[in-house]
Amino acid sequence: MRDIGINGIKLPTEDCNDPECPFHGKLSVRGQILKGIVISDKMTKNIVMKRYREKWSYKYQRKQRVSSKIHAYSPPCMEAKIGDIITIAECRPLNKGSSFVVIENKSNINFVDNLLNVDDKWREELYVKDLKEMISLIQKEIKSLPSKSSELPIRLDQLANCQRNLYFISGDIKQLEDSVDNFSKSVSLTPINSSDKLIRLISLGKTQSFLYKTTNDVSSLDSAINAYGEAIETYNVLSTITNNYLPYFLTASKNLADLLIFEYEKNKNASDLKRAVYYYNEFLNSAPTGTSNTPIVLKRLSSAMKYYYTLNQDIDYLEKEINYIQKAVNITNSSSANLPGLLIDLGDSLNEYYECGKSKIPFDKLEKILIESRNSYMKAKGLISDDSINLLKIFNNIGNVSRELYIHTNEISYLKEAIDFWRKSIKSEDLNKQNYSSNNILRLNNLAVGLIDLYEVESDPKYLDESQKIWNRLKRELWTRKNYKS
């Protein structure tokens, strides 16, 4: 996925092979960046967006709110439909009347995200008004259509999308429930093994996932799993004719696997975990090189291996966990915001592998594991800002790993490094006013013990004095914590 040079936008969650896509093709964006609501998606790849803005009225000497309509090109990965809240950017003229391209669809979000955040309250109210008008208009059209009309599933699809977007803005759960019902009707009226069936099943699965996330109703989770499973079956039939629908298969496979992981976490049924791993691997086996969701899938596969280790206590699963995260790190762009988190996860996995494998892994291999873990944390440290909440964790973990390396190698430089990073982690936590947390008490204890070890090696009394000060502070904090709790 290309970096288009615009900060603050939500990147597309799906891939596409459209050459006119700013993210997956070669189209450059420039100039104006505008936000609005889709009021028409009748054209094949173009949409009409309604934009609201404020302008100064010299006649009345006050601000006036006005609207305008803009045509924009919508790449397949944006999936912009009527009722969606979108962001468009100016580009070279793509076709008659269109010099804008959709670069963000706030409505096409993952079911673990929050409701839509509209920039201004007055815009939110206008979007709600527009959506209610669209819903009312589409409902009237549906009533006027014959029961076997080919237009009926299209209108039901549009109605469901508008209702889902109204839920995103207003939080009205009834709109989401109605959206699920109308997507279900649309799917039931769509011809079997058609491309429209595939697309609508995925929309149904996403909406049922939203409903599960909102209500925690297990039946919604099961329905979403069934919808994605049916979407994959539909794709398998379509793929014998053409491979144009591969992005939809990748979406269905990833989302189905994610839901099966949720199901496993709820019921601890090993068959759900096995199915999730199968569909994650189906995604990896089918995804073209450079697919944007591949690192995410690799990370989730690593989590699945952790679950397998918890079930079987087989250390080989921890090795697989490390391999998957390492692959995710290797294919993630160095400028990606996800890279520091992946590096921290890699360091954590290596640490766990070290702790669990002390009695099973050769001594020289244990040292290599520690060095890899330390290097992973060091790389993450170089990529995050000084005010990041992850910095404290990194400082502490580097200290712990360096201490273990000192025990393995007897190199004093590792002990000094451990002490230095423990000091930094304590200072960082002090700045965040978390002095009495159990983690900080553990860090103080580690630092005091490390200073005593350093004193025994170098016989410098300053280390002993500092250690004594740390012990005194530790006593004070333990006393304060005890009184605070009581």
Swiss-Prot record:
Listed disulfide bonds for this chain? none
Q: Name one GO cellular component term.
A: cytosolic small ribosomal subunit
What UniProt keywords are attached to this protein's entry? Answer: Ribonucleoprotein, Ribosomal protein, RNA-binding, rRNA-binding
Region annotation (30S ribosomal protein S17) maps to 1-112
**Source taxon at top rank:** Archaea
Supply the InterPro entries for this chain: NA-bd_OB-fold, Ribosomal_uS17, Ribosomal_uS17_arc/euk, Ribosomal_uS17_archaeal
Residues of the region (Unknown) are 113-486
The processes (GO biological process) annotated in the record are: translation
Query: One matching Pfam family, short form?
Result: Ribosomal_S17
GO MF, one term, reads: structural constituent of ribosome
The keyword Ribosomal protein is assigned to this record = yes
The Swiss-Prot or TrEMBL record describes its family as follows: Belongs to the universal ribosomal protein uS17 family.
Binding partners and assembly: Part of the 30S ribosomal subunit.
Query: Matching NCBIfam families, A to Z?
Result: PRK08572.1, uS17_arch
| Annotated function | One of the primary rRNA binding proteins, it binds specifically to the 5'-end of 16S ribosomal RNA.
Q: What is this protein called?
A: Small ribosomal subunit protein uS17B
Q: What gene does the UniProt entry assign to this protein? A: rps17-2
